């Protein structure tokens, strides 16, 4: 044990938090989570241990702007100004100090290992009692599961130790410091330390004791560590559970270790042995260790599909069977290896349906509770994810247990990121920083290696490629050869990774960055000498309204076996709740706390909002990742299972044939598909229909029974095909009265029955409509070529730094947002059965023509207005965001009914999950409440739209809400939006894709850009 004076002044003078060679003082060695059961049955059933006591709850807390500001008396007694805070928590969520959101830029001046003198410091204290029996024998430990970023610990006024690494436990022996009766803990937590230079992750920078604190009492002679691993024969019919156990204390001949393996109530295998490891060299072996091998016949294998869990109980006892203590862990029999360029689990090539997940809660910051963790896992499973990357640090210990039991593959990542360094490997190539990096990697492995869900180790994130990475890669491969190691830094294919693991590499497009080119994923596989699998550690940047082009990745994954999937960036929006002056909550992002530097809304890249409400993009991910694929040939549906291990024993295939959303025939068929097998389903012959409508076949895979992660009736997969229908002839309708045209100096007015249409002759726009005496428009019907910018349109542009390559900057520079209409033509003609209005406009900016729009409005005797639009786009202007029409309707109706793709928001490059049907939703559901307002709510492939008294027919895309594009564009946060008068309707003949390969460079694929130059579309507007 390191001994230094207990004096606070001496501790402050030492400044351990500015010395990369001091990562801990008196911290105990890492190990798997312990409970020190004194009853093996309680260990087997994982009952709460009487030897493990939580110290979570109310602690005394004082915040100071620097560590030197606290008086020495704090070590002995609480300060008068002390507040009460809950542990675990981040002190910023209690109003102390400000959270800082920054992606790359360090929140402090870069001068490693030094940190600012003004270093916000939290002083925690807790008074507690200890059971007297704990003082009489054994060892009492205190465990801090997570403290950000570094801390010193005192007990009863005496200094105990020091720890850093915010995301792994720091554990200390308190035995020599405790006394009978009351005891007092004092913890000095520093916001910044030299460790902060290794924790430059894209997240909120927060501080405090944010994970659990507990006391653990272990016997004097104790289990110090244990490690389990599984080995198999070639066909996985026989396995060996290898358990290595290390003890601490007096090594006596009578000591024994028994390892028993349980499946529920049934003991599968057991073995007992004395201590004494195998001979390593001429000096012998480890006297304090023992390795046991338990043979298991026909083990039930673990996978994310079928997470079969056994329980291993490790007992330390005497030769006569007297139990000293027991530890236990869940066990999954599974094998991970790379062979022939493929990542295999139990001999089968994996397809990683993964997502990156930060530990984030909108109210609690970086504090995770079991309910939130389970909620995340259930949502992931329900949306066909099978893997999660712990980005970018080891997670709460409970997370891994839950992943073991529910079934998720885990990439466990070391808490190392130096993204803001120039160059990035400035520290990771520096041997002075190897000890700090080493502790972050080795302790992660030692804590988490018993978890079957952990299938890959990661050396960290965005830290370049340094010699320290190579050393740590070799250490892991030596200590744990059962798992591959991945690391993206330095180009994604360095010597420190077993897997090519790029971030944001595109499917077909090379990105030729200096020194580290980012090849297309297809090309990467074929580089000379390259034989490794490729799994994207990050892809499909889900920031705001995004995930366009996601289907292209999944087409490639299924086409090329060595493209084994990837991890979407990322799971949850990192917005935080603030309250306005009236106590109303609102969602905040970077800069909203006065934090500088900050990266604005770049913290919100989730597939779900911070409260775990899904984004529309989550449905697209679910559909592309679904485990059943379908092929239609005639009346035959071929279903292929992508499950590797699971028989489809809880699935029904439900099919429906519908004409314009009206079901004509349906049935359901039990599914019985073997893993990686096929099932052929024959549909009955359907009558040939003569119809002008659209005939669609839709199949859904439904789970009739509830599972551990889904309710009964859960839909896991679906597909839709348009069927051929006989042509039909629409008979002419009976003659109608002819609309009457009235011309004045200012307007053309057309009247029919109780309806009127007014076209302004000076503007050339439809300026008003009446039904009876009620006006229908608040603004004229005008062309629209812009959208409220998406995050993907904005890229890295901001007020002080403009990216001229960003779509929004190109549109602004070209004048798309400022374009004004100049009338070329506005004429009216009375035809035999209709009135025809013909208009032409140029849309100009600073004398330059950007668009020419020609329209005809044909109003016939039935009251229908057929609108034909032809648009020319100037060859030297950027491709527009949309080509459509917009107006502000006077009515506010409760519901929207449409025949088209839905029900969720969809865009031209993100619509594979949408189905053609007749949908009916509340108006409020047509708006997607992205925290940073933008273009939202589009529905594509629409044939008919009904809203209030109006109906539109044609082939178009639309969005409809209470918010104008102008308001969306000018508003920084969703809570600042106000419902405008009436309803804004946007009807597009064409709409650009949204992109999403990344959010900092234009990523809309060429096929989804509006590059044709000439566009033509039609629609009919009538009143029901």
UniProtKB/Swiss-Prot annotation:
Sites where the protein binds Mg(2+) 1: 417, 419, 462
GO cellular component: beta-galactosidase complex
Binding site for Mg(2+) 2: 598
Positions of the catalytic residues: 462, 538
Gene coding for it: lacZ
Enzyme class: hydrolase
Cofactor(s) of this protein: Mg(2+); Na(+)
Binding site for Na(+): 202, 602, 605
Annotated S-S bridges: none
Keyword Magnesium: yes
UniProt cofactor note: Binds 2 magnesium ions per monomer.
Residues where substrate binds: 103, 202, 462, 538-541, 605, 1000
Example of a GO biological process term: lactose catabolic process
GO molecular function terms attached to this record: beta-galactosidase activity; carbohydrate binding; magnesium ion binding
Record key words, sorted: Glycosidase, Hydrolase, Magnesium, Metal-binding, Sodium
Organism per entry: Shigella dysenteriae serotype 1 (strain Sd197)
Source organism superkingdom: Bacteria
Catalytic activity: Hydrolysis of terminal non-reducing beta-D-galactose residues in beta-D-galactosides
NCBIfam families documented for this protein: PRK09525.1 (NF007074)
Name of this chain's protein: Beta-galactosidase
HAMAP family assigned to the protein according to its UniProt record, in alphabetical order: Beta_gal
Site (Transition state stabilizer): 358, 392
PROSITE patterns, sorted: GLYCOSYL_HYDROL_F2_1, GLYCOSYL_HYDROL_F2_2
């Amino acid at each position: 044990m390191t001994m230094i004076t207990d004096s606070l002044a001496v501790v402050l003078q030492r400044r351990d938090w500015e010395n990369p060679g001091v990562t801990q003082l008196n911290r105990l060695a890492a190990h798997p989570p312990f409970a020190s059961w004194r009853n093996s049955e309680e260990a087997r059933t994982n009952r709460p241990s009487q030897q493990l006591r939580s110290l979570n709850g109310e602690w005394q807390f004082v915040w100071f702007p620097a560590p030197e500001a606290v008086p020495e008396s704090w070590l002995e007694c609480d300060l008068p100004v002390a507040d009460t805070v809950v542990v675990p928590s981040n002190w910023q969520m209690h109003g102390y100090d400000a959270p800082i959101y920054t992606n790359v830029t360090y929140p402090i001046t870069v001068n490693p290992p030094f940190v600012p003198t003004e270093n916000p410091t939290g002083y925690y204290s807790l008074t507690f009692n200890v059971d007297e029996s704990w003082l009489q024998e054994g060892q009492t430990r205190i465990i801090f599961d997570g403290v950000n970023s570094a801390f010193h610990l005192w007990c009863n006024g005496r200094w105990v130790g020091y720890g850093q690494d915010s995301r792994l436990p720091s554990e200390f022996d308190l035995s020599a410091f405790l006394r009978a009766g009351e005891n007092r803990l004092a913890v000095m937590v520093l916001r910044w330390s030299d460790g902060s230079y290794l924790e430059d992750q894209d997240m909120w920078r927060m501080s405090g004791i944010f994970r659990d604190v507990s006391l653990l009492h272990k016997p004097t002679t104790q289990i110090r560590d244990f490690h389990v691993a599984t080995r198999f024969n070639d066909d996985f019919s026989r396995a060996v559970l290898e358990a290595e156990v290390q003890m601490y204390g007096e090594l006596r001949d009578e000591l024994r270790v028994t390892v028993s393996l349980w499946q529920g109530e049934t003991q599968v295998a057991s073995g007992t042995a004395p201590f004494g490891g195998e001979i390593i060299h001429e000096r012998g072996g480890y006297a304090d260790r023992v390795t046991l091998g338990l043979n298991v016949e026909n083990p039930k294998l673990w996978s994310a599909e079928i997470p079969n869990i056994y329980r291993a109980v490790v007992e330390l006892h005497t030769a006569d069977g007297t139990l000293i203590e027991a530890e236990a862990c869940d066990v999954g029999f599974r094998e991970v290896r790379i062979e022939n360029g493929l990542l295999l689990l139990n001999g089968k090539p994996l397809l990683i349906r993964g997502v990156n997940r930060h530990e984030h809660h909108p109210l609690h910051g970086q504090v995770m509770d079991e309910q939130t963790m389970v909620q995340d896992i259930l949502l992931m499973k329900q949306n066909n994810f099978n893997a999660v990357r712990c980005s970018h640090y080891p997670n709460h210990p409970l997370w891994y247990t839950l992943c073991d039991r529910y079934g998720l593959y885990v990439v466990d990542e070391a808490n190392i990121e130096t993204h803001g360094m120039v160059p990035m490997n400035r520290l990771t190539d520096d041997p002075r920083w190897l000890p700090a990096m080493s502790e972050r990697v080795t302790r992660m492995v030692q804590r988490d290696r018993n978890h079957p869900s952990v299938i890959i180790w990661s050396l960290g994130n965005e830290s370049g490629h340094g010699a320290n990475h190579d050393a740590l890669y070799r250490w892991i491969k030596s200590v744990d050869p059962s798992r591959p190691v991945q690391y993206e830094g330095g180009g994604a294919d360095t010597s420190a990774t077993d897997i090519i693991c790029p971030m944001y590499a595109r499917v077909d497009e090379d990105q030729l960055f200096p020194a580290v080119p980012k090849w297309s994923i297809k090309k990467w596989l074929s580089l000379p000498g390259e034989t490794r699998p490729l799994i994207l550690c990050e892809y499909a940047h889900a920031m705001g309204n995004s995930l366009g082009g996601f289907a292209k990745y999944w087409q490639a994954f299924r086409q090329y076996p060595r493209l084994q999937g990837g991890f979407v960036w990322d799971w949850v929006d990192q917005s935080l709740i603030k309250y306005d002056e009236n106590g109303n909550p609102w969602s905040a992002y970077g800069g909203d706390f006065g934090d500088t530097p900050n990266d604005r809304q770049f913290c919100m890249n989730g597939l779900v909002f911070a409260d775990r409400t899904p984004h529309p993009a989550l449905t697209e991910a679910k559909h592309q990742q679904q485990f059943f694929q379908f092929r239609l040939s005639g009346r035959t549906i071929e279903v292929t299972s992508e499950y590797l291990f699971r028989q489809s024993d809880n699935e029904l295939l439900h099919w429906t044939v519908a004409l314009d959303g009206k079901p004509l025939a349906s049935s359901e068929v039990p599914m019985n598909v073997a893993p990686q097998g096929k099932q052929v389903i024959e549909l009955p012959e359907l009558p040939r229909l003569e119809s002008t409508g659209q005939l669609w076949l839709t199949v859904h895979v439904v789970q009739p029974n509830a599972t551990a992660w889904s309710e009964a009736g859960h839909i896991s997969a679906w597909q839709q095909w348009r069927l051929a229908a006989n042509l039909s002839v629409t008979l002419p309708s009976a003659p109608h009265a002819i609309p009457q045209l009235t011309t004045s100096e200012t307007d053309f007015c057309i009247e029919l029955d109780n309806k009127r249409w007014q076209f302004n002759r000076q503007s050339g726009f439809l300026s008003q409509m009446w039904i009876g005496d009620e006006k229908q428009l608040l603004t004229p019907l005008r062309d629209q070529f812009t959208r409220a910018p998406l995050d993907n349109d904005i890229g890295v542009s901001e007020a002080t730094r403009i990216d001229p390559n960003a779509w929004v900057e190109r549109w602004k520079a070209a004048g798309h947002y400022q374009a004004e209409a100049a009338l070329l033509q506005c004429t009216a003609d009375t035809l035999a059965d209709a009135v025809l209005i013909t208009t032409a406009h140029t849309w100009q900016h600073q004398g330059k023509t950007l668009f020419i729009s020609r329209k005809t409005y044909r109003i016939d005797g039935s009251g229908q207005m057929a609108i034909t639009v032809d648009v020319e786009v100037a060859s030297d202007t950027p491709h527009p965001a949309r080509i459509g029409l917009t107006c502000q309707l006077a009515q506010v109706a409760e519901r929207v009914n449409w025949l088209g793709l839905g029900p969720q928001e969809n865009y031209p490059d993100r619509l594979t999950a949408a189905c053609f049907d007749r949908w009916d939703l509340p108006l409020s559901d047509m708006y997607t409440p992205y925290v940073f307002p933008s273009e939202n709510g589009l529905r594509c492939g629409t044939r008919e739209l009904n809203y209030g008294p109006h109906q539109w027919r044609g082939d178009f895309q639309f969005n409809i809400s209470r918010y104008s594009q102008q308001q969306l564009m000018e508003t920084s946060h969703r809570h600042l939006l106000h419902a405008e008068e009436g309803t804004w309707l946007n009807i597009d003949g064409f709409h650009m894709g949204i992109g999403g390969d990344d959010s900092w460079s234009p990523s809309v694929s060429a096929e989804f850009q509006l590059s044709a130059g000439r566009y033509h579309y039609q629609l009919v507007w009538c009143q029901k």
